[in-house]
């Protein structure tokens, strides 16, 4: 059980930022703010959300993409991170699992996720 002051602080933190609704299997495009010395720039990272864990301020999600030379790159982001400039849902995937860790072992067409058609 959390202290009520900590709970009030966390609730205030959650109100400040809104995120689009997404789940595991969705393809996301994340804008990450990178600060280099005096300059700031936005770098985009596009991949499939393979896991969402935690709740409240401690909530995180993991995004996986296949980079250069077919090397898998996974990044874990705090849900309410200040470095996330933007989050876009590009495609909504249809999966039957909450954690898609099995995609790590798959290559090529086997790693595809069906898209939800509206």
Swiss-Prot record:
GO BP annotations, alphabetical order: translation
GO molecular function: structural constituent of ribosome
Keyword annotations: Ribonucleoprotein, Ribosomal protein
Listed Pfam families: Ribosomal_L19 (PF01245)
Keyword flag ATP-binding: no
Domain of life: Bacteria
GO cellular component term of the entry, any: cytosolic large ribosomal subunit
InterPro entries hit by this protein: Ribosomal_bL19, Ribosomal_bL19_CS, Ribosomal_bL19_sf, Translation_prot_SH3-like_sf
Similarity comment: family membership: Belongs to the bacterial ribosomal protein bL19 family.
Function: This protein is located at the 30S-50S ribosomal subunit interface and may play a role in the structure and function of the aminoacyl-tRNA binding site.
Name of the protein in question: Large ribosomal subunit protein bL19
């Amino acid at each position: 059980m959390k202290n009520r002051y900590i709970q009030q602080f966390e609730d205030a933190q959650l109100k400040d930022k809104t995120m689009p609704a997404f789940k595991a299997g969705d393809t996301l495009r994340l804008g990450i703010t990178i600060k280099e010395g005096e300059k700031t720039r936005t770098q985009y990272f596009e991949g499939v959300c393979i896991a969402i864990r935690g709740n409240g301020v401690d909530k995180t999600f993991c995004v996986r993409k296949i980079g250069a030379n077919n090397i898998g790159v996974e990044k874990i982001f705090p849900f309410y991170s200040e470095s996330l400039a933007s989050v876009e849902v590009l495609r909504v995937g249809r999966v039957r699992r909450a954690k898609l860790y099995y995609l790590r072992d798959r290559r090529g067409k086997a790693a595809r996720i069906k898209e939800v058609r509206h």
